Amino acid sequence: MNLQRRSILLALSAGAALPLLQACGGGDDHEPTIVGLASGDSRFSILVEAVTAAGLVDTLNGTGPFTVFAPTNDAFAALLGELGLTKEALLANTALLTNVLTYHVVPGALRASDVQALPKPASVVTVQGAAFTVDANLAITDGRGRQAQLVSTDLTASNGVVHAIDTVLLPPAG
């Protein structure tokens, strides 16, 4: 087969395949996972480092659905000051990280409107096993009596929902 004929066949094949490829969508319009969403938002860079250090990336990339109450970098900075730790020391303590991070994850996809609809005060059980409380103003009280406010809500991921919070939640001691 000569070169000109091959070029024509290749062009026709590509033209015939184009509508099929467009119908499939190039994948660019798919929502990211929870980890992908957090990785793409500079407010959550410390959270992403912590999730990675704790070995929870695969879990939070899983099918879910999950709701993550995601502490911002400012929330982590405040916690480090409160505990007198460096970020490196926190990231090295995987048992502590896993305990704290799983306390921020709730099974199911809860939008802010779902949380608002819960009878108040609402006790929300986390995948860590302990619960935190949400009041009528959507303020969260953790297991140690510390309060967090929602900074941003309903960030949608392919496997759940993320709500940014201004405080790292701590589970009950013990």
Q: Where do the language-model regions lie?
A:
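Mature, structured domains of secreted/extracytosolic soluble proteins
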Residues: L3-L10, G15, L20-G174
